[in-house]
Structure formats: C-alpha cells, structure tokens
C-alpha cells in the first residue's frame, strides 16, 4: 500500500500483482 510498483492500473490489472502489488488510486502499490 505505500511502495509504488512503477505500474499503472487505469485500463488493465497490475501485472506485478503476482509479486504482491495491488491497485490503488490507478497505480500499483506493494503493501
């Protein structure tokens, strides 16, 4: 929830989701 994963999720899900990242405010965050 606090560390950006250098990925946006405006149109598509987070590919980094497999690494523990989740979508928040159109940006992928880790924890």
Curated annotation (Swiss-Prot):
Report disulfide bridges, numbered on this chain.
5-21, 9-23, 14-28
Q: What is this protein called?
A: Cyclotide vico-A
Processing and modification events after translation:
This is a cyclic peptide.
Q: What is the lineage of its organism?
A: Eukaryota, Viridiplantae, Streptophyta, Embryophyta, Tracheophyta
**Family of the protein in this entry:** Belongs to the cyclotide family. Bracelet subfamily.
Determine if Signal is one of this entry's keywords: no
Which keywords has UniProt assigned to this entry?
Disulfide bond, Knottin, Plant defense
Q: What is known of its domains?
A: The presence of a 'disulfide through disulfide knot' structurally defines this protein as a knottin.
Q: Which InterPro entries does this UniProt record tie to the protein?
A: Cyclotide (IPR005535), Cyclotide_bracelet_CS (IPR012323), Cyclotide_sf (IPR036146)
């Amino acid at each position: 929830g606090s560390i950006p994963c250098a990925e946006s999720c405006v149109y598509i899900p987070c590919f980094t989701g497999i690494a523990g990242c989740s979508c928040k405010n159109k940006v992928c965050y880790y924890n």
